[in-house]
Amino acid sequence: DRELIDEAAKESGLSSDFIENNEQEITSSFLYNLAMGNSYTYGMLGLGGTNSMPLTMQVFLAQQKVIQKYAANPCVIVGRCADFILREKTNVLRVFIYASMEERIKRAVGEYGYSEKKALDVIAKSDKGRARHYATFTEWDWGDRRNYDLMLNAGSLGVDAAAQMICHAAQDAEK
């Protein structure tokens, strides 16, 4: 995660802290500009450069370049629309890990010391942001099974078993 953020910062000219804090934040003004086809579209078409794009688009494009560079070698990329960015590659294992809300709250309470209410609020906000980010940049639905090769319920399997299953699937896919 940190390495990808730092590489994207170098690529975009933005600070690592800015990217880390804003990579999944899609503002309503960005969504409005996206719908209206305002100035950033000129940058996407190569007519105005990336500086005419909203910062969120600059961050996404910088991360996209870094993800594509990393994917030239064996690697693990968590999130960041990597399944979409690498959709043309055939040697990619696309995994979605999920758990019930009850299991996720339990984990957040245990790992971060949150109250159950705070855990629910943080998870709901995070899920909403991820879904909005994913839909904005991919036009796909976050968590849609059609976008993944493997989906695992870490709540019922446990984190270690899910990790072992992913490793096994990746090894089998290499054969």
Report each predicted region and the residues it spans.
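A short beta-strand-loop structural module common to alpha/beta enzyme folds
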Residues: 1-5
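Conserved phosphate-donor/acceptor-positioning beta-strand/loop module used by diverse small-molecule
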Residues: 88-112, 116-125
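A common structural junction motif
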Residues: 170-175
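ATP-dependent small-molecule kinase phosphotransfer cores
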Residues: 7-74
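RNA pseudouridine synthases
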Residues: 70, 75, 81-89
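Small-molecule kinase domains that catalyze NTP-dependent phosphoryl transfer to phosphate-bearing small molecules
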Residues: 24-39, 115-160
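Short, amphipathic alpha-helical "lid/cap" segments that border enzyme active or binding sites
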Residues: 64, 159-167
